[in-house]
Amino acid sequence: MNESSDAVHLNNHHRDTLVSIFQHPTSHNIDWKAVLSLLGAIGTVQETAEGKYHVTLDGTEHVMTRPRHKDIDVQTVVDLRRMLTESGYAELAQEVTDEGKEV
């Protein structure tokens, strides 16, 4: 992740979604559309005819399946954490969380 360019174009909704993904305990109400919006902001997302989503982050392609409901399940959160950590976004999530703690 290039911090100077990638962190700048994340709006507050993207940052909130990123923090929710890395939140402990795991959040059970992360909206699929919010996840797609975040992934589209930091990489590329292409939907296939089979309903799968090809997500490319930092040159690495991942395949995701649309959830049955509007929110993603715990396994998808785990997969997203892995993908985002590999792309350097765990640090940004921690920074955003720490900023929110400052009063």
What are the roles of these predicted feature ranges?
Residues 2-103:
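Basic nucleic-acid-binding interfaces
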